[in-house]
Amino acid sequence: MRSTFLFLLIALMAACSPGSPDATDGNDNPTDTIEDDVVETIYDPAVSWAACGSGEGDHPCNIIATDHNGDEFDLYANYGSLVVLDLSTMWCGPCNSAGAHAQEVQDLYADQDLIYVTVLIENREAMPPTEADIQQWVSDYGNTTSPVLAGTRGMLVSSGGTWELTSWPTFFYIDREMVIRDVDKGYSATEVLYSIEWLLAL
C-alpha cells in the first residue's frame, strides 16, 4: 500500500513539473503552432517601479490581458486590493483542483477586496490556450467574478520572461501595495486559505 501511494505521489509530481509532454518536437524545439483563435495576451514587463520580479518582496511585472468575460484585466489596476495570482496549465491535475475552488475563494473574501486570478499558460495539449479553452475552463469550474486569463510560456523566466516557476501551479500572494509577499508551489486548499489569512493580517 505504501509503495503504491509513493508511486502515485511521484507520478503526480512528475506530471506537473514546469516541463510538459508534447511541448517540444524531436529536436527539443518548442512546437509553437498557434491556432487561429489563440487569445492574444499582452505581457508588459515595463513598470513604474525601478524593477519588477516574481520573488517575495518584489513588485510583480504587469499582466494585461482580456479575461473570460471579454473585459481588460490589468494587474496594476488592482493596486490597493489583495491579489491571489495562480499560474496554471489545463493539463496539470493540481491546477484543475485549484481551478475548481477559485470562485469559491473569491466569494469567500470578496468583502476584503481580494481578487483571485487564474492565468492559464497552456491548454491540455501543452499549447497556448485558445478562447475556446478559456471558456471551457470557466464552464467546468464556474468562474464568474474570478478572472481567467490566457498566458503564454513567454511570461516565464525559462522563456525570457520574468515569472519564475518550478512547479504547476504556482501561487503569488500580492499585497495592497502591489508587493509579492508569499509564493507557494503546488496546490493545497488549506495552504491557499492560510496564505490569504496571513496576507490579510499584514
Question: Can you describe what each PLM-predicted range is?
Answer:
Residues 1-14:
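Sec-dependent bacterial lipoprotein signal peptides
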Residues 81-83, 88-91, 123, 167:
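Short pre-active-site segment immediately N-terminal to redox-active cysteine/selenocysteine motifs
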Residues 117, 132-170:
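Short, internal strand/loop/helix patches
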Residues 87-104, 126:
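Conserved redox-active cysteine motifs that mediate thiol-disulfide chemistry
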Residues 167-202:
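Thiol-/selenol-based redox modules, centered on thioredoxin-like
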Residues 13-46:
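Ser/Thr-rich, Pro/Gly/Ala-heavy low-complexity intrinsically disordered linkers and tails
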Residues 81-82, 97-120, 139:
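Conserved helix-turn-beta segment immediately C-terminal to the redox Cys motif
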Residues 35-76, 145-148:
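N-terminal "domain-start" segment that seeds a small globular fold
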